[in-house]
Amino acid sequence: MTNIRKSHPLVKIINSSFIDLPAPSNISSWWNFGSLLGICLMLQILTGLFLAMHYTSDTATAFNSVTHICRDVNYGWVLRYLHANGASMFFICLYLHVGRGLYYGSYMYTETWNIGVILLFAVMATAFMGYVLPWGQMSFWGATVITNLLSAIPYIGTDLVEWIWGGFSVDKATLTRFFAFHFLLPFIISAMVMVHLLFLHETGSNNPTGIPSNMDMIPFHPYYTIKDILGLLLMITALLVLVLFSPDMLGDPDNYMPANPLNTPPHIKPEWYFLFAYAILRSIPNKLGGVLALVLSILILIIIPLLHTSKQRSMTFRPLSQCLFWLLVADLLTLTWIGGQPVEHPYVIIGQIASILYFSIIIMFMPLASLAENHLLKW
């Protein structure tokens, strides 16, 4: 009798994706983040579902409903903080996952990479809309500032903003639709993740050397299932430490004040995981220019396969490119810090230099370093 694992129409899909999947024998812990992202997504959908059972998307009661969840619902505070800090873990894993792809040349699988970039945009949109839902001061003003950026689009801008708002300001209609989309998008993301994996399994995984590993593959289970479980335990530990010891560390104190359209907070800033993009937006004095730079700071990932000039795929054996890669990481950390600072000297000029450096490294310095490495190796 054939094994049900290999014969049942549904089970054999799971088998070929997570059990008998041939995987390179040398992939490091940097390859753990894909599975961690899947766990994060499931955690966010589950905690979000239970939060939605108690949340009301009305401007009069939204803030109080979140307070009610924390005070009166059994373990509601655990749900709320797991969801809020789960988003932070999600973005940590996302940025490390993208960074791994950049370092090891995984972007050469263009279909997988492009779906990944679209997924990144979708997750960012979901997180932004979720931040608006508690209807605190930073929720309201964050929504006002970010949606208002669309008014920079020539001719249709103002109409577009009012269409998104559902009125002449961020109000009840805006909150209701943001809740609807925030609930819907994670399920669309789940479907896109399936497509992401479908494209990945067409080619198989990359590995740290960047050299094809078809002649040296091992089954995913038990080797990488046990490795993924270790990664999961470490991530869950970090998340629980955050949730149970300092749940508000990554949040903004202003969001514990109910939204007040008549009182602007002194420093409007998004959650920490958007600060690098916010710093790039603020570093350009022109509104439309800032919006373009903001979008391009993420969209630039799409053209990275076109900027690959090296004869080698991975950066493992390319010291010049490695230096530039870590300079880019340091630059992004600098931008993240600047995004949280007020708009005054010297932060403005530091932000502008860091923004120019960000685009320069990706578009100019990295391709040139790759060509130099080819030349040094007489290729």
Curated annotation (Swiss-Prot):
It is found in: Mitochondrion inner membrane. Its cofactor is heme b. Heme b b562 binds at H83, H182. It comes from the Eukaryota. GO terms for biological process: mitochondrial electron transport, ubiquinol to cytochrome c. One of its GO terms (molecular function) is ubiquinol-cytochrome-c reductase activity. It is a multi-pass membrane protein. The chain crosses the membrane at residues 33-53, 77-98, 113-133, 178-198, 226-246, 288-308, 320-340, 347-367. Heme b b566 binds at H97, H196. GO terms for cellular component: mitochondrial inner membrane; respiratory chain complex III. Keywords: Electron transport, Heme, Iron, Membrane, Metal-binding, Mitochondrion, Mitochondrion inner membrane, Respiratory chain, Transmembrane, Transmembrane helix, Transport, Ubiquinone. Its main location: mitochondrion. Disulfide bonds: none annotated. The cytochrome bc1 complex contains 11 subunits: 3 respiratory subunits (MT-CYB, CYC1 and UQCRFS1), 2 core proteins (UQCRC1 and UQCRC2) and 6 low-molecular weight proteins (UQCRH/QCR6, UQCRB/QCR7, UQCRQ/QCR8, UQCR10/QCR9, UQCR11/QCR10 and a cleavage product of UQCRFS1). This cytochrome bc1 complex then forms a dimer. Component of the ubiquinol-cytochrome c reductase complex (complex III or cytochrome b-c1 complex) that is part of the mitochondrial respiratory chain. The b-c1 complex mediates electron transfer from ubiquinol to cytochrome c. Contributes to the generation of a proton gradient across the mitochondrial membrane that is then used for ATP synthesis. This is Cytochrome b. It comes from Myotis mystacinus.
